[in-house]
Every structure is written in structure tokens, then in C-alpha cells.
């Protein structure tokens, strides 16, 4: 949000102008709606749906990048934009650039990284263009309701693509909702984050619109069939909101880090730590997270072969190296058909190396938690930081079972990025409630 009290106002652009305020809100809404819905909603199931290099996406997201860049240069306070730059995120993107350079197909990896950069630019635009909390709430509500209502409409108008069929490579997903999104594993987390947006709007006084978004998103999320998502959403809300209600907001960062460590031990720990592996075999011998443990064990072997720089961006999954790899008959998961490792943290390590993973953990966990602790004790800042922390907690936990980090313009990744960068903003500037003229 560009209109701040802590930073001096620029004398070049009259940021308080109500017309510019409305234009900024509209542009931020359009950008967020596009990254949520994309230029190609309701795509058929299968590998073709995952391809992002078609001409529609290239032209569409290229135009979106120009719109976002133009908006940042003409409508946003440049000092606020500069404030969004984080040293740790620069290190992360430096590792990304390095992994592009030693990819098996650098031009293809560069195109994928360019889409990732466009997504980052779009989220920064969504965060800094709105002049105040009221404008940002409007952006979330309009874009969120557009994505939710379009997905509901798809159930009626395009049932063959808005609902998973039993004819694809995943017949077990038949009947589960995915709406305008590429997969139920994308639709579920997006709806979860939109439910947090509805709750944020509700807390700020937008009762009807916020409550509507919250309920509609929760209902859709429940029909995506993801029990993990359905459980993590209320858990994230309670773990973030409850400490603040009892005046113990300082506990939220402790809870966050405890949850991350606990989730790491409960998922990766039972694969790579022998005592935990033995304990899991005794207590829950069938615990495989739907076969994911076999996939993670394979990833551990691959990471050990190239621990420093990994295999390169876009250079592991869905490559000939994987396609022609021998598949043991007793492995629970056929890795040749996987498009990712179902663990975002392991995927960073296998693509970019362990040093890159270490930098990502600092940027993803440590820096946002520090920012949350530094948030001013002002109503709008607290509401906003709680919203971002809910997103961050949910997506960080979800990443132990799914993979979306640094993944082009994946809306789950972009919501996660919004949580991280938004927390940075909430900690550093006073968020005005509404434009006061």
C-alpha cells in the first residue's frame, strides 16, 4: 500500500487524488484476478494442461508484466516498492538464476523463470498499488469472488473440465472439484487462501462480502477432496488468531516455527531419520502419505548425488532422465509419471541444491516470522499481518505434501509469496484504514 505515514509522500505524483486511488485499486484487482484465474481457465486434464508455453499465455502474461511495471512506475510510491526488496529474496533469486544457467535446456528454463519473475512482479503490484486497507480489501474481495464464482459457474457450464473425470491418469480423483484451476491440488489451496481473505475482510467490517467469500471458498475447498487442506485451514486460523485474542500475539511466531519443525519430522523425518523411521513402522506401519514416502526416499538419493547445485531449474521432473530411469517393481510410486516431488522443500534441493534450500528456509520462514514480531501495534497492521501469517502457515505446511515454490505463475506459489512480502510491508509502514483526503 503506497499511501503511508512513515514514509514521506512524493511530490511528483499526487497520491491522495481520489481518482488515482480508484485507478490503482482497479489495476490491482485486475492483476490479482488474472493471476488467480489465468488466461486459460477450464483446461482439460493431463500433461497438456500443465504446459505454460502456449501463445495465449506468452502474450497474456507478457502484457500483464507490462501493465504491472507501468503501474509501479506511475502510480506507486517508489520508496515503498524499494522497501519490498529483501536481501534474502535476492539471494533466493540469485540461486534461481544459477540453476537456470546449468539447466539441461537453458532457453526453456529461462522462459519458465521469466514466468516466475512475472508472477513476482504481479504480486508486488497487488501489494503496493492499493492506497489503504480499505482499497486492499476491495481488491481481495472482487478478485477472490470473481475466481470463486467463475469456478462455481464452471461446475454447471463446463462440468467436463471443472470436475475431475475418471478417464485421465488419476481416476481416483473422479468427481472432485477443480473449477477454473488445473488440478484439485491447486484449487483446494487457492480456495483456502481466499477463505483467509474473506475472514480478513469480515474482521475489517466488510461482513457480507467477506462472509460470502469465506463460506463459498470453504464449501468449494471441501469438495476438492483434500482432507489435508480441510484440516489445515481451521488450524491455521486458530493458531494465528487465538494468541491475539488472549493478548499473547508473541506466541504466534513460536507456534509457527514449532509447526514447521513438527511437520518436517512427521513427513521427511520418518524417511531420513532412522529412529523416527523405526518409530513410524511400529506405531503406523502403513503411513506413507499416499505413497509419497517412496518418492521422497528417491529424491533423497538424487539430492545426495548433486547436493550443491542440484540438477537445474526445470531439469529433473518430466525429463528423459526420469522417463528412462528404471522403476523398481516394489516402489509405491512410479516416479516416471510425476511432475513434481510432492514436497516443495525437497524439490528446491533437487533442482537448485542444498545451499539454495537453506537460503529459501530463511526467506520463507525466518524473515516473515521476524517481520510478524516487528509489526506495529496498530489495528490495520495487525489485521493485515494476521491475514498474511494465516496464508504463510497454511502454504508452508501444505508444501510438505505438495510442490509449488518458484513455480511460474502457480496461484498457490503467488499466495505464498504474497504472505512473505506482505508481512514485510505490514512490519515497516503504517497502514491507513481508508483514504482521508
Language-model-derived ranges and their functions:
Residues 388-437:
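Transmembrane alpha-helices of multi-pass inner-membrane enzymes
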Residues 128, 206-209, 242, 351-396, ...:
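Hydrophobic transmembrane alpha-helices and their immediate junctions
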Residues 85-93, 106-128, 138-144, 148:
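Aromatic-anchored transmembrane helix interface
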Residues 23, 152-159, 223-224, 241-287, ...:
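A membrane-periplasm/extracellular boundary helix in multi-pass inner-membrane enzymes
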Residues 64-65, 96-97, 137-172, 179-245, ...:
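Alpha-helical transmembrane segments of multi-pass inner-membrane proteins
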Residues 281-297, 305, 309-352, 371, ...:
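Long extracytoplasmic/lumenal interhelical loops at the membrane interface
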Residues 1-98, 128-141, 204, 381, ...:
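Transmembrane signal-anchor hairpin modules in multi-pass inner-membrane enzymes, especially those
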Residues 17-23, 72-87, 201-212, 248-257, ...:
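Membrane-interface helix-loop-helix junctions at transmembrane boundaries of multi-pass membrane enzymes
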Amino acid at each position: 500500500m503506497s499511501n503511508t505515514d512513515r514514509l514521506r509522500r512524493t511530490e511528483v505524483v499526487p497520491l491522495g487524488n481520489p481518482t488515482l486511488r480508484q485507478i490503482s485499486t482497479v489495476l490491482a484487482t485486475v492483476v490479482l484476478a488474472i493471476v488467480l484465474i489465468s488466461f486459460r481457465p477450464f483446461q482439460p486434464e493431463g500433461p497438456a494442461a500443465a504446459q505454460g508455453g502456449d501463445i495465449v499465455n506468452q502474450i497474456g502474461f507478457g502484457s500483464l508484466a507490462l501493465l504491472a511495471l507501468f503501474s509501479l512506475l506511475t502510480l506507486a510510491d517508489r520508496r515503498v516498492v524499494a522497501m519490498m526488496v529483501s536481501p534474502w529474496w535476492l539471494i533466493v533469486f540469485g540461486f534461481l538464476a544459477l540453476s537456470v544457467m546449468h539447466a539441461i535446456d537453458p532457453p526453456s528454463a529461462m522462459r519458465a523463470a521469466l514466468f516466475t519473475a512475472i508472477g513476482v512482479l504481479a504480486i508486488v503490484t497487488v501489494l503496493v498499488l492499493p492506497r489503504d486497507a480499505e482499497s486492499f480489501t476491495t481488491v481481495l474481495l472482487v478478485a477472490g469472488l470473481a475466481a470463486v464464482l467463475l469456478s462455481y459457474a464452471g461446475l454447471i457450464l463446463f462440468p467436463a473440465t471443472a470436475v475431475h473425470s475418471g478417464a485421465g491418469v488419476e481416476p481416483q480423483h473422479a468427481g472432485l472439484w477443480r473449477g477454473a484451476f488445473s488440478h484439485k491440488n491447486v484449487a483446494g489451496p487457492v480456495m483456502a487462501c481466499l477463505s483467509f481473505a474473506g475472514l480478513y475482510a469480515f474482521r475489517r467490517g466488510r461482513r457480507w462480502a467477506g462472509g460470502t467469500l469465506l463460506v463459498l471458498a470453504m464449501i468449494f475447498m471441501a469438495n476438492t477432496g483434500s482432507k489435508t487442506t480441510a484440516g489445515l485451514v481451521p488450524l491455521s486460523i486458530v493458531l494465528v488468531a487465538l494468541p491475539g485474542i488472549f493478548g499473547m500475539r508473541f506466541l504466534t511466531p513460536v507456534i509457527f516455527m514449532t509447526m514447521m519443525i513438527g511437520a518436517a519430522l512427521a513427513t521427511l523425518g520418518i524417511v531420513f531419520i532412522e529412529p523416527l523411521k523405526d518409530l513410524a513402522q511400529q506405531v503406523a506401519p502403513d503411513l506413507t502419505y499416499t505413497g509419497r514416502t517412496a518418492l521422497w526416499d528417491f529424491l533423497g538419493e538424487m539430492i545426495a548425488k548433486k547436493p550443491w547445485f542440484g540438477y537445474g531449474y526445470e531439469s529433473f521432473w518430466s525429463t528423459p532422465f526420469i522417463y528412462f530411469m528404471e522403476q523398481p517393481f516394489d516402489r509405491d510410486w512410479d516416479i516416471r509419471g510425476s511432475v513434481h516431488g510432492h514436497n516443495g522443500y525437497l524439490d528446491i534441493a533437487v533442482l537448485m541444491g542444498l545451499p539454495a534450500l537453506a537460503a529459501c528456509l530463511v526467506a520463507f520462514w525466518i524473515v516473515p516470522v521476524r517481520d510478524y514480531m516487528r509489526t506495529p501495534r496498530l489495528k490495520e497492521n495487525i489485521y493485515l499481518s494476521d491475514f498474511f501469517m494465516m496464508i504463510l502457515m497454511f502454504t508452508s505446511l501444505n508444501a510438505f505434501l505438495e510442490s509449488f515454490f518458484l513455480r511460474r505463475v502457480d496461484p498457490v506459489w503467488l499466495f505464498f509469496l504474497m504472505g512473505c512480502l506482505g508481512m514485510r510491508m505490514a512490519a515497516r509502514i503504517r497502514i491507513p484504514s481508508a483514504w482521508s483526503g
